[in-house]
Amino acid sequence: MSESVPPTHTFTQIDDADLTGLNTLGLPARAQRLARPTTLDALSQVLAERNPAEPLFVIGEGSNLVICSDLPGLTLSLAIDGMSLVKQDNTHVWVAAGAGVHWDDLVAWTVEQGWQGLENLSLIPGTVGAAPFQNIGAYGVELSQLLEQVTVMDVVTAQVTHFAGNECEFAYRDSRFKSRDRGRYIITGIELRLNKMPQCNVSYGPLKARFGHLSQADILPAAVREHVIAVRQSKLPAPDVLANAGSFFKNPVVTKERGDALKRRFADLVAYTQPDGVKLAAGWLIEQAGWKGKRLGPVGMHSEQALVLVNHGNATSADVIALAEAVCADVQEKFGVALEQEPVLLP
């Protein structure tokens, strides 16, 4: 279903905008023009006044980006706000949120209402709009399991379209919006279906250790959220304290045969059986390759979580890319496994 949004509302635009504070790696960059539309009407107007031939970038809070140079053309940072209960039945609630909502604010609000589903995704940085783009996930839960629909705007026609969750082509840290339709749509909001009665997923690592002895009825979303936050804060640096883009590499998935072969060579290999093979813990691979806590110039892999690439100060995108390539090369040499970076490179 599509609908046109009339371009009637104004928007604020900044020329030659500094993006250093708008990417959590703290990389120096500027945008030729930066706009922050707060409504669908404002976004429609931004697109109507844009030259279709000029580059267009959407950056959210910049928590999953490596900005490699100044961005030409138009850069958007959506500020479409709002969280609401759409409908409910005896067992579920449907909630909506605008693309500009801080992701953890949405998680906190739903958990406060007693609704279950998002608690494992607590404290993931970024905005709601970025969540379906890369199908965020943590501790055994992915957004795709909870998402009912994504609302988008076509960058050319300004038409608003709603994609059902099963139309989004979700995969591990991927979606149609990140792959084949990248650049065609701007995500403006999402709708989720959550449980009224707790059915918390505590099958993953530290959650199983904390809650595994309890019955499902005794595991509350608020308690799971609290523990997830504690675990993340103990392992992951806050971007405002130590600049980073979260997990820098995806956990590679290999065939069962390859996983078994690695397990025979490395008895303490951290791996998880998947329908399509075996998922390896990239952080473990990086640590075993000698990169945990190791620096290369102003950047390095974090001392508590080897999966996180950090900027110790004054780093450039070239520094980041050089470190990522060095880590990948060493993991490939030691394990024969190729790592794939998670953040998007711009431009």
From Swiss-Prot:
Q: Name one cellular component (GO) term.
A: cytosol
Q: Which reaction is this enzyme known to catalyze?
A: UDP-N-acetyl-alpha-D-muramate + NADP(+) = UDP-N-acetyl-3-O-(1-carboxyvinyl)-alpha-D-glucosamine + NADPH + H(+)
Positions of the FAD-binding PCMH-type domain: 27-197
**Which EC number applies?**
1.3.1.98
Annotated protein name in UniProt: UDP-N-acetylenolpyruvoylglucosamine reductase
User: Principal localization?
Assistant: cytoplasm
Keywords annotated in UniProt: Cell cycle, Cell division, Cell shape, Cell wall biogenesis/degradation, Cytoplasm, FAD, Flavoprotein, NADP, Oxidoreductase, Peptidoglycan synthesis
Where it sits in the cell: the answer is: Cytoplasm
The keyword Transmembrane helix belongs to this UniProt entry's keyword annotation? no
Pathway per the UniProt entry: Cell wall biogenesis; peptidoglycan biosynthesis
Keyword Iron-sulfur tagged: no
